[in-house]
């Protein structure tokens, strides 16, 4: 008993210390995060393990877990990286309603030792709830007698969001009668009223439909609408009104009882009983009117009641009253004058004989169609009959004898306009009132083939994707023939012609009856971009008539050609290239360039390059240009970098779907001392010819400048002597200038002209030499310019064709077809206007010309101003005036001669993998270097010969 009492305080003290320690741990582990509501699953909330000071490796052994009393499934922790993320949808309005603060409280528990951390995740409100009105339509009833400034309260909208997202503003559709009075507050609407602006008129507008819109203050704002239907109640403020104040009618004396004399109609714009009208004779009423006529109080019809007698009373004057049924009735009045007419009781008779129907539409005018006779049993003026015909018809009546008429064609017929005529012959006697009789004649018009089939438009444009299945329907032509029956039966056929070396019928066919055009074989955009032909439509008339329509079928390109890597040069195998580079290079050093071409066009041939990082790792110090294919370093290399790198370059076009190709680049890192040896051997064969080429160009430029200076001095001396010399006998006149030579490089150009002088007296012929004209077009090459005869000025403006012995190098041809040059490349297309040739522009994606690769020479039919420097596929960046390109070619330079004299089996390195590092020289390049030196000597000799010719 004593021992248990002595050991009691110690466990209590231990328990107390544990509670204090747990409370201290709990307080020190409080974390706060925030996340927007409606965040997607996996949204990052915070690095909870790092913030709690826990290592990632101890999360699993220490049983790291998250618990929540009410919302345990909203947030979760990834035990691999210690990140707290959104596990399920979080709706702030569902969690906290309209509370200003909304948080999710979590408890993080770890064992060994036991630790408890409190985490508070604040849920931020987003504008995800639009304003909502209690109802989508609200009806309001307003009497038209309500005065202006009357207010009609409205129910405001509510927004489940908080703060600015729930601040509502209202707007009403513009109108002339109502305006909106709204007092805004940040949280809710205090009052919302509809105010009447001016007096209403139900007779003008019976119902107003307005749209009330509520907008919250979120970004972007959300809106809610309610349609206000305002019905105007009627007030009896309008009296019935007749259309006329006085009506005049006539009635025959032999009219039967109940004969309608007139139907009076009064209108009241009021509604309901206020607009119901009762008709009556206005008092006092004469006994004669009461005896002869009666009035219907509901519809205003006045009918005969007793027998009328023209000899006893010829005219009745009746006063009629119209009264509405409003609480305070209002009345309208009019006067009716009824005239009684004498009777002509015998009508004429009409007889039609000798019809010639139907008639052809090509019948000539004045042809007789029918004979008509009329008669009337009355005598005097009541028996005198006149005939008339339906107006506005191509027929007329011609009186041939007393009471006899002929129906004659008056003008040309057109069955396509009117196929039949319903003629009405009216015979009227001379009685008072006159009696008449009518007879109908149906005249049919027979068709004549006078209309050719007509298409809706003279030309149709059709777009067909390439690789279509054979026999697919691409278009339907339809021609309409205004004729009838066989004359309108249309058949279709192709207008045969040759398309290249093949007949048109081998490409397309047309169905004779339906006009459907079919493609007989798959079309290829790369071979045929436009197919233009004609379809003929003919009717079945005698003789047949026809017309043609032109179809322009454009073959649309599809992405059916994958990018193709250009064949690598020596030292490469397949799509793989090896390269040595020193470790001492800095960031941005270009190592190698990958090139590819795509046979498609447009976006289908626009190529982009990217490294496949998954194959080589994510920390390589290299990157590739998206559109250039240049592989360069991203940072300086250090010792920890691997000595060998294998890069996979993915070449992808922009078609749908995109097609790809893969190139492999093997890079080996060497020390700085080893790089120059490999570099000197690798660049000896490639740089040497280019350096020699630049030296020769410099010499040529110096020589040309010296010769030009000498010519200028000679010209000045000649002019001075000419001016000081006495005039020669005879008359001399300048002849037409002849262009000797003109050349351009970049924005600099020079030219020469000869102007022979034609003299009529004694003295030698002289020639004026004009040099360095900056605005003349280029002439032909030096071999053709010296022996050319004098031409007219018009001949100088004609474009020159390129020399047949000039051609592009392999790299330049590849650049012309690369992704960057798709729109700038010169492509020969056989279009409607004939083939035209464009030369490619120089872009940043094309490297500077290597040995044996030059720009097109001046005089080869190319305007040097069209060679512009471009940076990527965007807008061209033109060189400024007075700027010279880094390298340009002078006509007759060794570069051109080397190209013209290059043998067919030349093994000059034209690798399309252009490397900028330094690699070892192979045995083939050593042999090639010796051959190039011999070739350069020959080219220098040829260059001297060409310069002397110029």
Swiss-Prot record:
Glycan-carrying positions? 257, 265, 548
Which Pfam families does the record cross-reference, listed alphabetically? Cadherin, Cadherin_2, Cadherin_tail
User: Which compartments does it reside in?
Assistant: Cell membrane
Kindly list the cysteine pairs connected by disulfide bridges. none
GO MF terms, alphabetically ordered: calcium ion binding
Cytoplasmic compartment residues:
719-950
The entry's protein name is Protocadherin alpha-13
Organism lineage string: Eukaryota, Metazoa, Chordata, Craniata, Vertebrata
